[in-house]
Regions:
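Alpha-helical transmembrane segments and their helix-helix packing motifs
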Residues: 1-150
């Protein structure tokens, strides 16, 4: 019985971390797209501050980076390992939970979870996130959708 509870716990957290990564990617994408609209720099910064506030990460961010700016918020929310809510941190935690119950997962679920983590890590290492194109969030988000669908 203990083994079933542990498996259920890992599956719950795998899904929860995957969902959190997806939600963060969506919020970043919406904020990025909004920042492209004609507006003052002050209004754009309010959007980035709002994103941090919604995520309850504004104090942690300002401790590390000080003033809010789009580039630092993106890096903090996508790849900063000191941020447990960053996309990379969430995908790493989801992958570790999936790995812990690898024997109970279908091959498709494991491969999708692992491939998503590998792809995002590759994008971060190649600095595609910094130069960020629409495709970056779209491809990451579609991989996460596939994890949920499988």
């Amino acid at each position: 019985m203990r083994s079933c509870a542990r498996t259920a716990d890992h599956l719950f957290w795998m899904s929860r971390y995957t969902e959190r990564a997806e939600n963060t990617a969506r919020m970043l994408d919406v904020n990025y797209q909004t920042s492209l609209l004609p507006q003052s720099e002050g209004v754009a910064l309010v959007g980035w501050q709002g994103l941090l506030s919604i995520s309850e990460l504004l104090p942690a961010y300002t401790t590390l980076h000080g003033d809010v700016n789009a580039r630092d918020v993106m890096e903090f929310m996508v790849k900063d390992e000191s941020n447990p809510s960053s996309i990379m941190s969430c995908l790493s935690a989801a992958r570790e939970n999936a790995r812990a119950v690898r024997g109970t997962l279908t091959t498709e679920v494991w491969e999708t979870q692992n491939q998503t983590w590998l792809e995002v890590r590759r994008m971060i290492k190649s600095r595609r996130v910094r130069a960020r194109s629409q495709a970056s969030f779209s491809s990451g988000s579609s991989s996460v959708h596939t994890c949920h669908a499988v």
